[in-house]
């Protein structure tokens, strides 16, 4: 298995496509094995949180970033875990 890396995914999503459509920019930091997996994770999260269809999301850039540049503390804490403990 490969090493899990941090990726920055930037793009635009179409909000209110039926009345007064508007494109919103987004920047999302995710952990993934490959850039393709990072894009898949972002599409899944945007669809879940904002009810946006995949064809209403345009990915503009996927960049691997070092852990020092990730502003999301939750991702850094998850990356430092070595195992899960079930109660």
Curated annotation (Swiss-Prot):
One of its GO terms (cellular component) is ribonucleoprotein complex. Belongs to the eukaryotic ribosomal protein eL20 family. Part of the 50S ribosomal subunit. Binds 23S rRNA. Keywords: Ribonucleoprotein, Ribosomal protein, RNA-binding, rRNA-binding. The keyword Disulfide bond does not apply. The lineage of its organism: Archaea, Thermoproteota, Thermoprotei, Desulfurococcales, Pyrodictiaceae. The gene is rpl18a. This is Large ribosomal subunit protein eL20. SUPFAM superfamilies: RplX-like (SSF160374). The keyword RNA-binding applies. Pfam families: Ribosomal_L18A. GO terms for molecular function: large ribosomal subunit rRNA binding; structural constituent of ribosome. It comes from Hyperthermus butylicus (strain DSM 5456 / JCM 9403 / PLM1-5). One of its GO terms (biological process) is translation.
């Amino acid at each position: 298995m490969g090493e899990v890396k941090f990726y920055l995914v930037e793009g635009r999503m179409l909000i209110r496509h039926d009345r007064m459509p508007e494109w919103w920019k987004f920047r999302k930091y995710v952990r993934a094995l490959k850039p393709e997996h990072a894009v898949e994770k972002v599409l899944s999260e945007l669809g879940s949180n904002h009810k946006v269809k995949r064809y209403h999301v345009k990915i503009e850039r996927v960049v691997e970033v070092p852990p020092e540049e990730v502003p999301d503390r939750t991702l850094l804490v998850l990356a430092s875990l070595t195992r899960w403990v079930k109660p």
